[in-house]
Amino acid sequence: MSEKYIVTWDRLQIHARKLASRLMPSEQWKGIIAVSRGGLVPGALLARELGIRHVDTVCISSYDHDNQRELKVLKRAEGDGEGFIVIDDLVDTGGTAVAIREMYPKAHFVTIFAKPAGRPLVDDYVVDIPQDTWIEQPWDMGVVFVPPISGR
């Protein structure tokens, strides 16, 4: 990745509120499925803004900090996604998005950020990001990048 795009907590909340406004009325949704780990914080923000209490996760591993690696489903939410919003922070090359679409064909799949290769795979997103740009999310940073304590 040649460029970095730094996301601050306040910008993330602004983007999540914008996305939530597009998902109104909230009564049309049974719940939210957050893609772990990138979709956990955006999922919590959407749940708050939409007043949704039913929140589940699908746990998919496809990144090892700066590098993409093989996709692995660790845990999935039940059902085909009907009436659910599936949220991730980013759609990049589309590997995770394809898996999400296969698992939850009836879900409404949204992200905060979208790169060109993955854009056609989501129903909605807020911010366009160039394909060669790495996104630094606020939960991954202190003043400088701070690796997770577990090393994973």
UniProtKB/Swiss-Prot annotation:
For binding 5-phospho-alpha-D-ribose 1-diphosphate, which residues are annotated in this chain's numbering?
R37, G38, R69, D88, D89, L90, V91, D92, T93, G94, G95, T96
Q: Where guanine is bound, by residue? A: D92, I135
Q: Where does xanthine bind?
A: D92, I135
One GO biological-process annotation of the entry reads: XMP salvage
- Give any GO molecular function from the UniProt entry: hypoxanthine phosphoribosyltransferase activity
The subcellular localization recorded is: Cell inner membrane
- Its domain of life? Bacteria
Q: Which InterPro entries match?
A: PRibTrfase_dom (IPR000836), PRTase-like (IPR029057), Xanthine_Guanine_PRibTrfase (IPR023747)
Q: What is its EC number?
A: 2.4.2.-, 2.4.2.22
This protein's UniProt keywords: Cell inner membrane, Cell membrane, Glycosyltransferase, Magnesium, Membrane, Metal-binding, Purine salvage, Transferase
**Reactions catalysed:** GMP + diphosphate = guanine + 5-phospho-alpha-D-ribose 1-diphosphate; XMP + diphosphate = xanthine + 5-phospho-alpha-D-ribose 1-diphosphate; IMP + diphosphate = hypoxanthine + 5-phospho-alpha-D-ribose 1-diphosphate
Task: Provide the residue positions that the database annotates as binding Mg(2+).
Answer: D89
Give the binding site residues for GMP: R69, D92, T93, G94, G95, T96, W134, I135
What is its cofactor?
A: Mg(2+)
- Its topology with respect to the membrane? Peripheral membrane protein
**GO CC, any one term:** plasma membrane
Q: Enzyme class, one word?
A: transferase
Pathway per its UniProt entry is: Purine metabolism; GMP biosynthesis via salvage pathway; GMP from guanine: step 1/1; Purine metabolism; XMP biosynthesis via salvage pathway; XMP from xanthine: step 1/1
How this chain assembles, per its entry, is:
Homotetramer.
Q: Which HAMAP family match?
A: XGPRT (MF_01903)
Q: What is stated as this protein's family in its record?
A: Belongs to the purine/pyrimidine phosphoribosyltransferase family. XGPT subfamily.
Explain the purpose of this protein. Answer: Purine salvage pathway enzyme that catalyzes the transfer of the ribosyl-5-phosphate group from 5-phospho-alpha-D-ribose 1-diphosphate (PRPP) to the N9 position of the 6-oxopurines guanine and xanthine to form the corresponding ribonucleotides GMP (guanosine 5'-monophosphate) and XMP (xanthosine 5'-monophosphate), with the release of PPi. To a lesser extent, also acts on hypoxanthine.
Which protein are we looking at? Xanthine-guanine phosphoribosyltransferase
Q: Give the source species.
A: Escherichia coli O7:K1 (strain IAI39 / ExPEC)
